Amino acid sequence: FGTPYVTFKNLEVLDKWIKNPDTFYNGQKRTLFLSEQNPNSLDYTEAALQEQAAGLAFALKKVEALSGIDAYIAHSWIDAPYEGGLKTGLRKYPDDPVDPYGRKPAWFVFRDWETPQEDETFEFAKKQIDITSWDQIFHDVKDEEQQNEIKKENALNVYI
């Protein structure tokens, strides 16, 4: 599908791949869990926490819309000091001097995902991501054959 990596930004690639009959097992789509996931917050500044929460909203909106993905499993509920400085949890370090186990903005995003509160809770993330509609985060994924056809069309257009 023309990409060396699968990220939340191009998650449609994985969705299209898993729904390709060539990847099926006994004629059925394989189960696909995104496990041990969560965006990181660099630190506990408000900007970093909002960025993490917006990243989580982005990821969850993708998962929600892509039918090939069966589940999203958060990496950890709390930041863990033994993970090399990563802060991928939905709550702060247990020994944080200001707010031990404090709920990060990402906690509220995860809590309200797929509930009637989702739209309201996720609204802040659009500004952070620089979009006006969640539709803007989705991309059409072309398989290799489609990409080759586009290249041929583009090459022909050069001569026309």
Task: Name each model-derived stretch.
Residues 41-160:
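Aromatic-rich peripheral "rim/lid" segments of glycoside hydrolase catalytic domains that contact
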Residues 1-46:
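Noncatalytic carbohydrate-binding groove/subsite architecture in carbohydrate-active enzymes
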